[in-house]
Swiss-Prot record:
GO-annotated cellular components: chloroplast; mitochondrial large ribosomal subunit
Descriptive protein name: Large ribosomal subunit protein uL16c
InterPro entries according to UniProt: Ribosomal_uL16, Ribosomal_uL16_bact-type, Ribosomal_uL16_CS, Ribosomal_uL16_dom, Ribosomal_uL16_sf
Family from the record: Belongs to the universal ribosomal protein uL16 family.
Keywords from the UniProt entry: Chloroplast, Plastid, Ribonucleoprotein, Ribosomal protein
Cellular localization per UniProt: Plastid, Chloroplast
Length: 134
């Protein structure tokens, strides 16, 4: 699963999911893409599940670009712990996704197979997506 090798700080504020995506909202590498239509946090496990769904649907000869990276740590306190005593330890990593962001791009593949792969990825994601082509 994806996670940063090294970060400047172990913990981050939660932040807010406001506005639309201004970077990463165009197709840059492949011919087809999967675009987010709503804001969400996508975990590294969900990103990997989407990648597996694409590779299983398309089999050989496809090129996949993952356009998001989980660089935000999410902390959790242990169960049965009283309030206070600081923030919890980092448990998993998420990518902050805003509407318009390209999640995956695909190349060297027919449009019909790419559409089927995009549909399979949509089942794995926690947000609404759409299929985009050049």
């Amino acid at each position: 699963m994806l996670s940063p090798k090294k970060t400047k700080y172990r913990k981050q504020h939660r932040g807010r999911l406001k506005g639309a995506c201004s970077r990463g909202n165009r197709i840059s590498f492949g011919k087809f893409a999967i675009q987010a239509l709503e804001p969400a946090w996508i975990t590294s496990g969900q990103i990997e599940a989407g990648r597996r769904a694409i590779t299983r649907t398309t089999r050989r000869g496809i090129k996949i670009w993952i356009r998001i990276f989980p660089d935000k740590p999410i902390t959790k306190k242990p169960a049965d712990t009283r309030m206070g005593s600081g923030k919890g330890d980092p448990k998993f990593w998420v990518a902050v996704v805003k509407p318009g962001r390209m999640l995956y791009e695909m190349g060297r593949i027919s449009e019909s197979v790419a559409r089927k792969a995009a549909q399979n990825v949509a089942y794995k994601m926690c947000l609404h997506t759409r299929f985009v082509k050049i």
